[in-house]
Amino acid sequence: MPLLISPFAELDLIRQPEQQDEPLQAFDAADEYLLNHVAQAGLSLPSRVLVLNDSFGALAASLAPHATVISSTDSFLAAQALEKNLARNGMSYDAVPHIPASEALQGPFDWVLIRVPKTLALLEEQLIRLQGQLAPGARVIAAAMVKHLPRSAGDLLEEYVGPVQASLAVKKARLLFATPQPMEVRTSPYPTRYRLEEPAIELLNHANVFCRDGLDIGTRAFLPHLPKNLGTARVADLGCGNGVLAIASALDNPQAHYTLVDESFMAVKSAAENWRATLGDRDVRVRAGDGLEMQEPDSLDVVLCNPPFHQQQVVGDFLAWRMFLQARAALVTGGALYIVGNRHLGYHTKLSRLFRGVEQVAATPKFVILKARK
């Protein structure tokens, strides 16, 4: 893989999760453009730099020796990548503190460097949280590849920070410079809420939760076919989002024990709040993590999963395949993985390579619900 070469450092970076023969690099031209601009503008200690949505630590690791850097993302994998890439390049793994996007930031910040996220609601929430956190004369710069930079990103910067100037495009990347202005403090429109009829529950969704304004159609297809009569089974909701699958299952299985895991900190916070609102103090484990990577082998009886098919702007089934491998390792012999997926993704064939028995539980014109037994 090529090195990230900037005026600050030459770094050997890896993506998370790691893949054998990884076809993609852990930085892009927008990272390079932003680092070159910051170097030209002049960055030095004791500047406090906030880096938002740095997917694999390219920005934070480059700047760490030259300023006090704080990173904030909504991704457990991004936090893990930052630690690994710092250590990989001769720095302490904790040289840059990471603040989950679900938690408050503590300014003041002299620089705010933003990689524009795929979900603009996350950007809006982050900009709202910046209110009162900028030092006098602070610089706020957002970066993105042009193909992933909607006009509305600039509109949000202007609404919550101040006037925006766009750079020329360089290597298909662009920077947006926002000049902070005194503004009336705004309240956040997040979290949002919606109600389900079956089961009859209300779900809260923080800004970066998938389908935060309503139930996604895959989950809607899955809900009527969740397993029942689980007794005291140990159940995991893998990639739990707002927790709806686990909560619906728990309502039907009052003695089962649940673990909810997602790599989004905002999803985990949403799931924990939804569980408490619906099920009170019933015992549960809700955690951010790299799927079931840290789950003890042979420690689960059932896994529920609506697998993602993209990581940021990268589309593919590599995350789903990884989840299937993790589920197989965590399940006891005879345990079962239940999934929903688009018909065209061919999950039945993929699961048949890993599990001794795969059956179709139900189907709609667009989705299949599958049960794979270890």
Curated annotation (Swiss-Prot):
EC number: 2.1.1.174
Keyword Glycosyltransferase included in the entry's annotation: no
Keywords annotated in UniProt: Cytoplasm, Methyltransferase, rRNA processing, S-adenosyl-L-methionine, Transferase
InterPro entries linked: DNA_methylase_N6_adenine_CS (IPR002052), rRNA_m2G-MeTrfase_RlmG (IPR017237), RsmC/RlmG (IPR046977), SAM-dependent_MTases_sf (IPR029063), Small_mtfrase_dom (IPR007848)
This protein's record includes keyword S-adenosyl-L-methionine: yes
Compartments in which it is found: Cytoplasm
Residues forming coiled coils: none
Pfam families, alphabetized: MTS
Catalysis performed (reactions): guanosine(1835) in 23S rRNA + S-adenosyl-L-methionine = N(2)-methylguanosine(1835) in 23S rRNA + S-adenosyl-L-homocysteine + H(+)
Enzyme class: transferase
Recorded superkingdom: Bacteria
GO MF entry, a single one: 23S rRNA (guanine(1835)-N(2))-methyltransferase activity
GO cellular component terms listed in the entry, alphabetical order: cytoplasm
Function, in words: Specifically methylates the guanine in position 1835 (m2G1835) of 23S rRNA.
PANTHER family: RIBOSOMAL RNA LARGE SUBUNIT METHYLTRANSFERASE G, RIBOSOMAL RNA SMALL SUBUNIT METHYLTRANSFERASE C
Family: Belongs to the methyltransferase superfamily. RlmG family.
Record HAMAP family: 23SrRNA_methyltr_G (MF_01859)
Protein name stated in the entry: Ribosomal RNA large subunit methyltransferase G
Originating organism: Pseudomonas syringae pv. syringae (strain B728a)
Lineage, broadest ranks: Bacteria, Pseudomonadati, Pseudomonadota, Gammaproteobacteria, Pseudomonadales
